[in-house]
Amino acid sequence: EIQRRFLTCGDPSLQCDYGVIMVYGVQFSTIELSSNERPKACSDTEAKNGPSNRCDGNEKCDVATSGSVCDLCNSAYLTNIFLDVTYGCLESKKVTTCEGVVHLECGDGVVFLQKALYGRIDSQTCSQGRPQSQLTNTKCSQEGTLALWSQRCDGKQTCEVNMRVNQISDPCVGTYKYLDVTYICLPAKTSITCEGSTSSLDCGKGVIKVFHANYGRRDGSTCSAGRHELSNQNCLQPKTLDVVKQWCEGKSQCTLGLDPVFGDPCFGTYKYLEVSYTCLGGSPTV
């Protein structure tokens, strides 16, 4: 369910009583004390994207933190700043396995990881049939688990998290560990564009909201016809999301030439651009 809230710098909070926040759109305006032109900072991308950057994936947040729109738009000519925020509360899904392998599925949506733990933080989970000596360490966690699997799963409709083949190291030798993953399913579409082509997103009368983007390769089947350079399936371009947001977010349509924009994050691998997005006020066409 999409909700709408008017925020001010004196009351900057968003909260979901259930689920987590996902900001879909932000508009802002000001009341001026004089006829002087509104400061240019009030139309800056950073000011507009602030609520989304601070709130997405959280149960509650304060928009007016350091560097927020309240700082960027502050001037002697303004008495107040109003943020018109459209957002939704998305239900979280939690899966726990003692085997170190979980399958994440989102049907028509796409996966967005919130939390991921590989280790042990209590003595009850996955304890059946295990000796007490394997359960006593409850401060055990594999560092980097969330970052690793966010890179590999975010933006996909389905994803397998397998710590058996992707474990960096053993965070606590002698402790019986489990895998605990919390994620949400974003109501998004996915655009795939193969290397050497031009990517176009079109929302008709709506505007583009980008959730995830990567230029590289995360599986062996996408854009694979007639290609042999597919063995590297962990090819990531970290700047992809920021670039796609800068070019496309808030527009009704946008076009990206892949090679000159993203460079070559993994030489010798045939790459593709994947973008998970939705259309606010319209239906996406690719």
From Swiss-Prot:
UniProt KW Isomerase keyword: no
Temperature dependence: Retains hemagglutinating activity after heating at 50 degrees Celsius for 120 minutes. Activity is abolished by heating at 80 degrees Celsius for 90 minutes.
Database matches in Gene3D superfamilies: 2.60.120.740
Pfam families: SUEL_Lectin
GO annotations of cellular component type: cortical granule; cytoplasmic side of plasma membrane; extracellular space; germinal vesicle; perivitelline space
PROSITE patterns assigned to the protein according to its UniProt record, in alphabetical order: SUEL_LECTIN
Domain of life: Eukaryota
Single GO MF annotation: rhamnose binding
SUEL-type lectin domain: residues covered: 96-186, 193-280
UniProt-listed InterPro entries: Lectin_gal-bd_dom (IPR000922), Lectin_gal-bd_sf (IPR043159)
Alphabetically ordered keywords of this record: Hemagglutinin, Lectin, Repeat
Job description of the protein: L-rhamnose binding lectin. Has hemagglutinating activity towards rabbit erythrocytes, but not human type B erythrocytes. Agglutinates E.coli K12 and B.subtilis.
Full protein name: L-rhamnose-binding lectin CSL1
Native source species: Oncorhynchus keta (Chum salmon)
